[in-house]
């Protein structure tokens, strides 16, 4: 029997009750070592394993299996898959050309299997990845194989996949998905412009790396980025879309404060659109984003425990959660 969104939303709303609460986060912050954190997560039924990475992997697998069983149309998650495909293709490309193992670096779920990526790279047959990616992937291969410029090779792939993510999300029936990935690509451009300015990247690099997306003044930002960090931040501080001006203020505090602002901005969008929605795919997508954010929270807490960072500092770094 075909699944309905009415059923899916009811199921997701029940699942949301198991998402982290402030009490859960406080308990994790109080753990004295990573083993204690692992025990807490295992006892809560979050995932299985002897260490944090195993538990997170187990949890991710369970979330995706649940979404497969629950979502009427699993293809709605394609933009998220493409982000994993981007990571995987970079790993396979660099691993193949440097003759290093890469299998352990690959993440799921994804659109392209490890075997497909392997065949595409080893045989330089990027048509296996589809018409929309073929030319850019071949260009990235050419750059890395003949110049060793991993940064430029990555930039070519980033641009191609960001454009594909935009196109795919805009074709969906979800206004939220379109808006969420516009914001994702927007801030990917912001990060690229800042990194480019700090690394003294030339205009040619930035023209390749930064893509067109609504509300992002591409030409103006590229022109500023070539001049350096201060001119770049000045131009970005005058952009109000997606709270960019506020993000720049956070960057001036610290890069980590900026990253937190961006993550929280995306989470606020999900909470505003998905938690209030009573139909369509948005509530299911919101649950996925919530689960991914929880993984970031666990990583931050585990890192704080390992480095013996004080409670207030770790808490300040935590992302806003969905629950």
Predicted regions and their residues:
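N-terminal domain-start signal
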Residues: 1-323
